Regions:
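Short, well-ordered beta-strand elements
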Residues: 286, 297-314, 424-428
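Short beta-strand micro-motifs enriched in acidic
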Residues: 275-279, 299-303, 383-387, 416-419
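Active-site SXXK
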Residues: 15, 21, 48-73, 149-157, ...
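Short, conserved catalytic-motif segment at the N-terminal edge
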Residues: 1-47, 69-71, 78, 86, ...
Length: 519
C-alpha cells in the first residue's frame, strides 16, 4: 500500500482483514486530511464507502424477507404507496431484479449529487421525480443501477416505517458495534471531525473534494471506519453472527450468498446484491465503491473465512486498489486442493450465440434524455479474426471448448448471447454490452456530425469571402434584398450550429461532473 500511494499520488489508505470471527489486521497509511496533517487511523478515520453501502441495503432487504414483510419475487409496486413503476413490459419489477441489477432501468447521472444538505429531498420524493425509463424486460441482462438499490432501500423504509439511515443504525450498525459509522447525511456532529477528506489526484497538486450529499441514500450514503467494516464482514462470514448479536439467520445468509443471477453459467454473476468474483478457482463475494474521490473495495472468501476491506482517499486509487485485492487473494486464498462445488445455475433468458462483429455499448445506458449522447459517442468496436479470436476493449479473447472466450490480458471471460427479443449481447464477468443498430454506431454519428459541420463551415465562410473582396477593392456581387436576408439567416444558423458543436465538444471532453448536481 505505501508503494501504491507513492505511485498514484493518493494521500492515504485504510485496510482491515478478518479471518473467521476475528479481526486479524487493521492499519492506516498516509494522510486522511492533508491540510490538517491528520494520519489515517483504522478505527477512527471515516471513509465514504460509496456503493458498498448497497450491501447494507441488501442485508436490510433480507432482514425484512425474514420477517415476512417482503417477498423477493413480488411486484415492487405493492410496496410503493406514492408512485408506481410503469408497466412497460408484461413482467413486473421485483426485489430480486433490483438485487441482480436486472430490472431493466436506464441509467442516469444528472441530479445524482447535492451540494447543500438543505437541498436534499425526501427519498420517496426524489425517486418519484427521477423514475428512469424501463428499456428492457426485467430478468434478462444485468445493467448496474443505483436507482434500483435506492428503490430497494426506500421499500425497506416503507414497510418498517423507519427512515433509511435510522433503520441502518438500529438494525445493522448498533448490533454490529459499528459505533463510528453512519448512513446519515450530514454526518453527525460527533463523527464529523473524524471524516477523512478525499482528493482529486488526477490534478497536480491533488485538490480536496468538497463533501457531496447522496439523494439516493441507500445507494451510497454510508461513512465507516475500517474496523467497523470488519465487523460487517465477520457477520457475513459467520452465519449472520457478530459476538452475541445476530443480524440474519444462518439459512438467510446462505440464501443471500447463493448465486441469484448469471447471464451465462460459466460467468460470474450476482448473489443477491454481492458481485461474484472468481479468483484462483475460488468464488468470492465482493463489492466496490467510488464516491467523490474515495475508492473502496470489500471482498469475502466464504471458502476460507477470509475478508478484506480497503479504501483510498484519492480518485486514482481504484485500479491500484483492485490490483492489491487480487494480490491479496493470490497470497492468502490460493487455489483450493480440490475444486469448489459449482454454484447453482439460475435460468437465464439469454442463449449462446455466434460471435458477431460490430459496435457495442454498455447495458448501463441512457435512452430517453440528453445523456444518450454518451451512448452514441461511447460505443466500443468488436472484431472477429479468421481464427476465431475476438478483439474487444483493447484485449484479445481466445475461444475455449466450453464456448467462452478468455482474455489474454486479464482474468476475465466473455460470452456471446442473444435474448428472446433478438437483441445481441457480449457479456463478461463484470459487464454486459449490447450490439448497437447501425444507425447508432460511432461512424454513422460522426458522419452525421460532418453533414452538419461542413455546410455550416461553408455558409459561415461567406462573410469572410465578402470581407476579403471589400479589402481588395473588388465590387460586391449584386443581390436582391430577399437574397441578402436569406444569406444572413443562413450565416446565423451556421454560426449557431458551430457554437452548439463547439459547446458539445467542451462538454464531452471536459469535466462533466457538474451535471451530477442537475441542469
Amino acid at each position: 500500500i505505501p508503494e501504491t500511494l507513492r505511485q498514484t499520488g493518493v494521500p492515504g489508505a485504510v485496510v482491515s482483514v478478518v479471518s473467521g470471527p476475528s479481526l486479524v489486521f487493521a492499519d492506516g497509511y498516509g494522510l486522511a486530511d492533508v491540510e490538517g496533517g491528520v494520519a489515517f487511523h483504522p478505527s477512527r478515520s471515516l471513509v465514504r464507502i460509496g456503493s458498498i453501502t448497497k450491501l447494507f441495503t441488501w442485508t436490510a432487504v433480507m432482514q425484512q424477507v425474514e420477517t415476512g414483510r417482503l417477498d423477493l419475487d413480488a411486484d415492487v409496486n405493492q410496496y410503493l404507496p406514492d408512485f408506481q413503476i410503469p408497466a412497460t413490459y408484461p413482467q413486473p419489477v421485483t426485489l430480486r431484479h433490483l438485487m441482480n441489477h436486472t430490472a431493466g432501468f436506464e441509467d442516469f447521472s444528472i441530479g445524482t449529487q447535492v451540494a447543500d444538505a438543505a437541498d436534499l429531498p425526501p427519498l420517496g420524493e426524489y425517486l418519484a421525480a427521477h423514475l428512469p425509463a424501463r428499456i428492457r424486460p426485467p430478468g434478462q441482462v444485468s445493467a448496474y443501477s443505483n436507482y434500483g438499490a435506492a428503490l430497494a432501500g426506500y421499500i425497506v423504509s416503507v414497510v418498517t416505517g423507519e427512515p433509511y439511515d435510522v433503520y441502518i443504525r438500529r438494525h445493522l450498525l448498533e448490533p454490529l458495534a459499528m459505533a463510528h459509522s453512519t448512513a446519515a447525511e450530514p454526518v453527525p456532529v460527533s463523527l464529523r471531525d473524524d471524516l477523512a477528506r478525499s482528493y482529486d489526484t488526477e490534478t497536480l497538486p491533488p485538490q480536496p473534494i468538497p463533501f457531496t450529499f447522496v439523494p439516493q441514500a441507500p445507494d451510497g450514503s454510508l461513512s465507516a471506519t475500517a474496523t467497523d467494516m470488519a465487523n460487517f464482514m465477520i457477520a457475513h462470514l459467520n452465519e449472520g453472527r457478530f459476538g452475541d448479536a445476530s443480524i440474519l439467520e444462518p439459512a438467510t445468509v446462505a440464501r443471500m450468498h447463493a448465486r441469484s443471477f448469471a447471464a451465462h453459467p460459466g460467468l460470474d454473476g450476482y448473489a443477491h446484491g454481492f458481485k461474484e468474483l472468481t479468483v484462483n478457482g475460488r468464488r468470492t463475494l465482493m463489492h466496490d465503491g467510488g464516491w467523490e474521490g474515495f475508492r473502496s473495495g470489500l471482498v469475502l472468501v466464504p471458502g476460507c473465512g477470509l475478508g478484506l476491506f480497503l479504501s483510498f482517499n484519492g480518485s486514482t486509487g481504484g485500479i491500484a486498489g483492485y490490483e492489491i485485492l487480487l494480490k491479496f487473494l493470490d497470497r492468502f486464498a490460493p487455489a483450493p486442493a480440490t475444486p469448489e462445488a459449482s454454484e447453482s445455475r439460475p435460468e437465464s433468458t439469454l442463449t449462446p450465440a455466434e460471435p458477431l462483429a460490430g459496435f457495442y455499448h454498455s447495458t448501463r445506458q441512457n435512452e430517453s434524455t440528453i445523456e444518450k449522447l454518451v451512448t452514441l459517442l461511447g460505443s466500443l468496436s468488436l472484431s472477429v479474426a479468421a481464427d476465431g479470436t475476438v478483439r474487444f476493449r483493447g484485449q484479445h479473447w481466445t475461444p475455449q471448448p466450453d464456448g467462452l472466450y478468455h482474455s489474454s490480458d486479464s482474468r476475465e471471460r466473455l460470452a456471446f448471447l442473444v435474448g428472446p427479443d433478438g437483441r445481441r449481447y457480449v457479456v463478461t464477468d463484470r459487464t454486459a454490452y449490447e450490439l448497437l443498430p447501425s444507425s447508432e454506431t460511432l461512424p454513422v454519428n460522426l458522419a452525421v456530425l460532418l453533414v452538419i459541420v461542413l455546410p455550416a463551415l461553408a455558409t459561415a465562410a461567406r462573410p469572410v469571402g465578402w470581407a476579403i473582396r471589400r479589402l481588395r477593392g473588388r465590387p460586391a456581387r449584386s443581390t436582391t434584398a430577399g437574397w441578402r436576408i436569406a444569406r444572413g439567416l443562413g450565416v446565423g444558423a451556421a454560426v449557431g450550429a458551430l457554437l452548439f458543436l463547439g459547446r458539445l465538444l467542451v462538454v464531452l471532453l471536459g469535466d462533466t461532473s457538474e451535471f451530477s448536481y442537475g441542469v
